[in-house]
Amino acid sequence: MLKREIFPVANIYVPTARRKTLDLKRVDAIAHSMLTEGQQTPILVRADGARFVLVECLHRLEAAKALGEATIVGYRVEARKH
C-alpha cells in the first residue's frame, strides 16, 4: 500500500516530454482549488538518486509552485521494469 509523503517541490524533476503538455488554465483552476480546499490528490513521483522524477500530476505540481508552496504531498512509486 502506498504511503503519503511530503516532498520538497524544488527536488522534483519534470521530464521534458511531460512539460510540453502543460495547460496554464488548468494550473490556475487547480491552484484556486488548492487555495480553497487544500491539496486533495497526491502527486506520483519516483526516486532518482537525490531527486524525484514526476510520474503523474504535472498540473498539480505546477499549481503548488505557482502558490509558492515549498512542499507537496505525494506517493513514491517504483519505476516500471521492462
Where are these regions (language model features)?
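Short, charged recognition helix plus adjacent turn
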Residues: 82
